[in-house]
Amino acid sequence: MNFEELFSVSEKVVCVTGGGGGIGRGIARTFVSGGAKVYIASRSDLSDVAAEISEEGPGECLALSVDMSSEESIKKLVSDLQELEGKLDVLVNNAALGGFIHAFEKFPTNEWDQMMNANVRGPFLLVKEALGLLATAATSDAHASVVNIVSVDGIRVAMDNDWAYGAGKAALIQLTRQ
């Protein structure tokens, strides 16, 4: 087996949440450049982004919808992937909610709930729901993979009252260790 075969993603099916910009978009582009079929999922319509990434080829990029704070939306995403592909080789939990900056004693409970739902509960539910698709893709020669994108904020002391984001990323780090 040569290097290209060992690390090939050609014909793999990949789902990247939060794939419209930044890290997620970069991950999607990289998989497409390796020949994978990539689904980018977001609350926003990413059809134009997917078309742009697909042009770079040789793989393909398509857009799906998901709200990582909604169990119903997560189940719909997995159902769509099941219908379209029947398997999932790689799941990248990249979508995250941030920007709620408050001192601890002034942090609104509803913002805490929104952040934890999107950044911890959502990835947990998505992995749980996608286990069947991941198991279908796995073979004795090639395992399916889950990649949870976290942050240094999950392991360091919070700066500028951004502690809630860090708490969520710390929880995701622990979830990943399971």
Predicted segments with their positions:
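Substrate-binding pocket helix/loop in short-chain dehydrogenase/reductase
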Residues: H102-F104, P108-D113
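Active-site loop of short-chain dehydrogenase/reductase
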Residues: K12, P58, K87-L88, L134-V152
